[in-house]
Amino acid sequence: MTLNIRYLLGIAVLFSFSVISAQVRTSYTFEKGWKFTREDNADFIQPDYNDIKWQSVVVPHDWAIYGPFGVDNDRQMTAIAQDGQKEAMEHAGRTGGLPFVGVGWYRLNFDAPSFAKGKKATLIFDGAMSHARVYVNGQEAGYWPYGYNTFYLDVTPYLKEGTKNTLAVRLENETESSRWYPGAGLYRNVHLVVTEDAHIPTWGTQLTTPVVKDDYAKVNIKTTLVVPSGKQFDAYRIVTELKDKDGKVVTTDEKQGSRFDDNIFSQELVVSR
């Protein structure tokens, strides 16, 4: 019988001096409240722009699946070498005739009550097709051209405390940019993560299971810590819990930071029957 190692990982980063406090991490998933248009205008980034006439949508959202469908949506003049064609011919692409080419804009007004001075804020896009330009409160926070990757942006400098914030996202699918239907729009979830100044960054935890036996398993965890200016890594320690599917703690480990560890906690936990 193989040991089941499907465990939940719980991590707390503790400051060793003065007041000890666990890391606070608040995550928001932005699903409702979005406005959408296929028009294109530079004024759409402005927080006070009136988008009341835009379409109300829920994210994830794909603008192309609603049609209209047709050959003109991706008409191409090309020679398809795989089909033995020697000269360019008219084709409808291989994208199913969906109207994915062109520009789309999304806007959202949102609150972030956990954000305050000294906190860090990260926007995470699980999927945005494509050439995403992201604006927060009228300022460009970042650009990500590739539509198939999750990406994240540090929006701490642009977020406002204690008031509404405005997120605007411009997406553009270019002509002849795909050999299949690639999707269109914010086709996966959008998240805002607010952390303390000392925090585990996005994708800052690496977990492997180098040994899995019938009666025990070893779990190796590497956790990166972003250390605030003026602080030292050896002033922090990490407390890690592994929980089973029912939420029961099956093993724990603590480790103090060291100035020789390059701001990475390395731990090996053993889980046994």
PLM features: residue spans?
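Short, solvent-exposed loop/linker segments at the N-terminal edge
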Residues: 209-217
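Residue-level detector of high-confidence beta-strand sites
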Residues: 39, 59, 143, 252-254
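Accessory beta-strand-rich segments of carbohydrate-active enzymes
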Residues: 26-30, 37-40, 96-209, 228, ...
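Aromatic sugar-binding surface patches on proteins
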Residues: 149-151, 261-272
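Accessory carbohydrate-binding/adhesion or oligomerization-edge regions at the termini
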Residues: 22-87, 166-172, 186, 192
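Bacterial Sec-dependent N-terminal signal peptides
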Residues: 1-25
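Beta-strand-rich binding/interaction modules
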Residues: 136, 217-258, 265-267
